[in-house]
């Protein structure tokens, strides 16, 4: 499978128009050489490789539209999006109330599209031979605000007295919000004495370079670095379950399986080049997800995606046509 190197924070990809079917969907086709302009997308580092690959594939059959995909974190991306600085925002969690209010105040209308499923993955170094499975309570004990857990044997007396070195996403990350919400019971509630980064490769390097390292990020980053890291099985009360496409889809990898989103602006979708890109993204969602080593939607979820996009296109068809970026 093809992979996108998530070390990059901005990708500029030349892509262009497809002949867009009437509102409601339809097939895409190449060859509309009159299509031009730019599409700007920012947001989640977790969703970044997926959208970047969609843009890359769009380029192979079209030319003339520049698609720029950035990676400033879900929260940082929503700040830009609600200021009108991007056409869409990648997100690893739903938009928050304060973000929705900011968009509403700025007159930015949008809609969420679920483009893939993720298994938020807890990782340790290859030198860690003891933490093969952790309970959600143990994770909470490690990551809770004010936690003083410093060594592995404080989590389980059978573990060695090895210092725990923690790595994770920064506070602008949707992954941080999701993890803290399901593990600590409140979004943003976390101990602060860890190494944060919006670049998941920094987390990979930190955990893999420390015998007692522990971190978390999206499943695709684990798959790309499985030679350096070990994925920890999670026990939420029904036994140890490893992260995988199957366990994320069937819900057994609870509570760390989650949907991944792209939020396009309704006004941006009124521009032909933006609508064409997202039509391509939706129509080819399964192959894009598989190509980027993500967990694709099941048939029911894919049907919902197409219906959601058709509804957004219908709204865009009545929106004032903005000036192309």
Predicted regions: what is each one?
Residues 1-11:
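Bacterial N-terminal signal peptides that target proteins for export
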Residues 17-22:
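C-terminal motif of bacterial Sec signal peptides marking the signal peptidase cleavage site
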Residues 23-325:
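Flexible loop/hinge segments at secondary-structure junctions
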């Amino acid at each position: 499978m093809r992979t996108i190197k998530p070390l990059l924070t901005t990708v500029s990809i030349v892509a262009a128009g497809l002949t867009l079917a009437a509102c409601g969907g339809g097939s895409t086709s190449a060859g509309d050489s009159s299509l031009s302009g730019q599409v700007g997308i920012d947001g989640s580092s977790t969703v970044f490789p997926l959208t970047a690959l969609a843009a890359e594939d769009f380029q192979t059959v079209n030319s003339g539209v520049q698609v720029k995909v950035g990676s400033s974190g879900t929260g940082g991306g929503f700040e830009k999006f609600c200021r009108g600085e991007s056409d869409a925002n990648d997100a690893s969690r739903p938009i928050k109330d304060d973000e929705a209010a900011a968009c509403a105040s700025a007159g930015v209308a949008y809609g969420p599209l679920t483009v893939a499923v993720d298994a938020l993955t807890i990782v340790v170094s290859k030198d860690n031979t003891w933490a093969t499975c952790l309970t959600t309570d143990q994770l909470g004990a490690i990551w809770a605000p004010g936690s003083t857990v410093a060594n592995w044997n404080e989590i389980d007396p059978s573990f060695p007295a090895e210092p725990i070195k923690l790595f994770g996403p920064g506070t602008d990350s949707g992954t941080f919000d999701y993890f803290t919400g399901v593990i600590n019971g409140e979004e943003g509630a976390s101990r602060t004495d860890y190494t944060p980064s919006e670049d998941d490769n920094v987390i990979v390097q930190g955990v893999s370079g420390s015998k007692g390292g522990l971190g978390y990020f999206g499943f695709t980053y684990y798959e790309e670095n499985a030679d350096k890291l070990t994925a920890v099985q999670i026990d939420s009360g029904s036994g140890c379950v490893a992260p995988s496409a199957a366990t994320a889809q069937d819900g057994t990898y609870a509570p760390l399986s989650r949907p991944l989103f792209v939020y396009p602006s309704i006004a941006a979708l009124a521009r032909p080049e933006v609508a064409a890109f997202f039509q391509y993204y939706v129509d080819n969602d399964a192959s894009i997800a598989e190509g980027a080593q993500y967990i694709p939607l099941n048939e029911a979820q894919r049907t919902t995606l197409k219906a959601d996009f058709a509804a957004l296109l219908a709204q865009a068809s009545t929106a004032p046509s903005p000036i192309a970026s």
